[in-house]
Swiss-Prot record:
The name this protein goes by in its record: Histidinol-phosphate aminotransferase
Swiss-Prot/TrEMBL GO biological process terms: L-histidine biosynthetic process
Enzyme class, UniProt record, top EC level: transferase
Cofactor needs: pyridoxal 5'-phosphate
Amino acid sequence: MIEELIRSEIRSFIPYNANQQPYKIKLDANESPFTLPPQMRKKLAEYILEDPQLNLYPDTDSVQLRQALGEYWSVDKENIIVGTGSDQLIQIIANVFLEKGDKVLYPTPSFGMYKDSCVIAGGRAVDYILDQNDNFSYSADKIIKTYELEQPKVIYICNPNNPTGNLMPQDEILRVLKACTKSVVVVDEAYAEFSDTTVIPFIKEYENLLILRTFSKAFGLAGIRCGYSIASEKLTRAVNLTRPPYNISSLSQFTAALILSYKEEIQNNIQYLVEERERVLSKLKEIDGLKVYSSAANFILIKVQNSKDIYRKLCEKGIFVRAFSSSPLLSDCMRITIGTQEQNSILLDELYAICYNK
């Protein structure tokens, strides 16, 4: 009886299932390998000891955090909304803009929430396929052509793209913005710190541009579930219409605002991971039978014919990476998060041994 009550569009959904098995090295979720700076941990402890009054609801508008983000990005706090991870903001965008049957244009392969949020809101998800023969490159021409044909309410660009790691050049994104004026163009920059690129400076020029950012990747705060959007004031006010009240806990607001003051430490971590990414890329390319995709993020996508077998053997060693066996375009692919030099070296050694039967 319960199944009959579920909306027909939702019945086929499969709840997200992260690998919960014991592990030795975890390189499957694009998390940072770095914990918080010691001085920051001390300040967090002081915050708790001083009684943050957790018996009270948090600031429903996250004013201090938005102010800190505004100063960090040189924008006004009125350009910013904070969400429980960018996942919540993606769902809010769908709830605000989609009437039943309205369309969302999203890249494939990419982050699954773009499609799921659309379906949950009663919309129609229309994908544009990234060019598999050109390292999954974006095409502004393809996006614009599909926009003209489908007239979507929302267009998603993931930049760098997850899970392929490639970048859409800024001038190509601007072409899309200039042509697709009747859509909200969402540029998801969850991994942009690793590519040193952003379209945030263009929010004043393009009223329909919305950028998504997160504290989960470069800032190493996946555990507090905090993301944010930056857009024109008019677009920000629209998105804020269905944001749940008190959606960010007091602890999360304080922690996210605090880490913004540790720019040097965070930048050092980013630089470390970028250097490791390039080292791992180079080493992976030395292994016969692997197709290795260049990356502007904190992960690398590889393709190999016996990926399921390799994935299983890595898991047996306690090394977790992400497999995509259910994705037609990525059925032979695995995504490897960049960890510490020690973690990456262990992975490379095990991968080498598996591929060469040693």
